[in-house]
């Protein structure tokens, strides 16, 4: 009788342990399922390209504002893409080439002193400026940038722009001009002296004769 009682107790104890283990297993499974449901899913940030476009657009607008501060610039546009920053300016059609180059130089100097425009390229060719404006619109509309980037690189390689990093400082230009003027005056004086010497020589020779 005592042995039977012990067997019954052992059976109850084992059943209770098995029940407790099963309950714990269910709790662990439920907790794991709950964590999976609440755990954030990491996916590719599809807005990154939009953010990049926004940044490029903001910089382009800033470069346009810098260029348009020049009173001789009627309108401006800019495209910032990849490693390129190209600024196109509209000027008076009646201006001669030298005046246009002077305006380009002035705009390039302004961009050189700007943190976003130090490597910008300035162009004033009407057709190219018009195309730049179209490219800017295409970028803002979300068109693929690969083809635009290739075309932008071709524009930079085709035109002869003012590159602000390579522009000579304003302080150097007057000095160079002054040196050239001094050299020209010196050469002129030497030529006049030589002519006077030759004239004196001929006069003395004629007197001796």
UniProtKB/Swiss-Prot annotation:
Membrane topology category: Lipid-anchor
Signal sequence region: 1-16
Domain of life: Bacteria
Residues anchoring lipid (N-palmitoyl cysteine): 17
Pfam entry (one): Spore_YhcN_YlaJ
Coiled coil stretches, renumbered: none
GO cellular component: membrane
Residue ranges, compositional bias (Basic and acidic residues): 28-54, 183-209
Record region (Disordered): 26-54, 165-209
A GO biological process held by the record: sporulation resulting in formation of a cellular spore
Keyword entries, A-Z: Germination, Lipoprotein, Membrane, Palmitate, Signal
Reported consequences of knocking out the gene: Mutant shows a reduced rate of spore germination in L-alanine.
Lipid addition sites, S-diacylglycerol cysteine: 17
Name of this protein: Probable spore germination lipoprotein YlaJ
Organism annotation: Bacillus subtilis (strain 168)
